[in-house]
A protein has these predicted regions:
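Radical SAM enzyme [4Fe-4S]-AdoMet core and its adjacent flexible, acidic
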Residues: 76-88, 95, 99-219, 225-229, ...
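Conserved glycine-rich "GG(E/T)P / GGGxP" loop and the immediately following alpha-helix
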Residues: 1-137
Length: 250
């Protein structure tokens, strides 16, 4: 009964508030009978203002804030184009969301640095008053120049997958230990008070329920991904030339 739009990037707020006002207007004009449209926005929060938050609240946007823990950990990799730290601006965005009553959650990318300090990351998120938390692993493939490249192919030429990812990528066992440490604390203190997506989805699948997160489902393809130029993919985990389904302008 619902049609979900998930606005991601890059940084979707760079499109401007006027763009999203137009989006909502078009959605209202074309929503099919009996359906309801929902919008979610994933942002680093640095461009949020009172005007942005007023719009997001009035139009029932769910906002995900990308923040990787305390400043020391967050700013290790999240610098702006001028190589300036962004943590203070992201925190200010969180405060604005709270001020305006915008529904929001936090997404923390687990990397080689903060992957060693799981409880610091988890407790930091809780201190921000956040009740819903996502953790996703940073896994970037090395290109021939030694720089990160976008690709889904992490094994080639007989090399170990570890040799094919950037130094800032979280290691498999490290990510596992990160989740275990947080799970133990969550189980002791925070069940029904804090919701960690990965734990909820895993427990739902274990209990025989159908998970809502696509990576836990039996079949892929329920969440289409559109690029800014109209290119269409069956999943945002496979936005690669060989997986392109077509273009909506063709």
């Amino acid at each position: 009964e619902e049609i979900h739009f998930n606005w991601q990037g890059g940084e979707p707020t760079l499109l401007g508030l006027g763009f999203f006002r137009s989006v909502v207007k078009i959605q209202q004009q074309h929503v099919p009978p009996g359906k309801r449209i929902t919008n979610a926005l994933q942002t680093n929060g640095t461009l949020l203002t009172d005007a942005w938050c007023d719009f997001l609240r009035k139009n029932n946007f769910l906002v995900g804030i990308s923040i990787d823990g305390p400043a020391e950990l967050h700013d290790a990799y999240r610098l702006d184009k001028r190589s300036r730290p962004t943590h203070n601006r992201t925190e200010q965005g969180l405060k604005l969301l709270n001020k305006h009553g915008v529904e929001h959650n936090v997404l923390a990318v687990v990397n080689r640095r903060n992957g060693e300090r799981p409880l610091e990351v988890y407790r930091y998120c809780k201190r921000q008053g956040v009740k819903f938390i996502q953790f996703i692993p940073l896994v970037e493939q090395l290109g021939s120049t030694g720089q990160a490249v976008s690709s889904t192919h992490l094994a080639s030429g007989g090399q170990s997958p570890i040799d094919l990812v950037t130094k800032c990528s979280v290691r498999p066992r490290q990510f596992g230990n990160f989740l275990i440490a947080i799970f133990d604390e969550w189980l002791r203190h925070d069940v029904s008070r804090v919701f960690v997506q990965l734990f909820d989805e895993t427990l739902a699948a274990w209990g025989g329920q159908s998970p809502s997160l696509c990576i836990f489902q039996k079949h892929c393809g329920r969440c289409l991904a559109f690029e800014h130029n109209g290119d269409l993919y069956s999943c945002d985990h496979f936005v690669e030339p060989e997986y392109k389904l077509g273009n909506i302008h063709q």
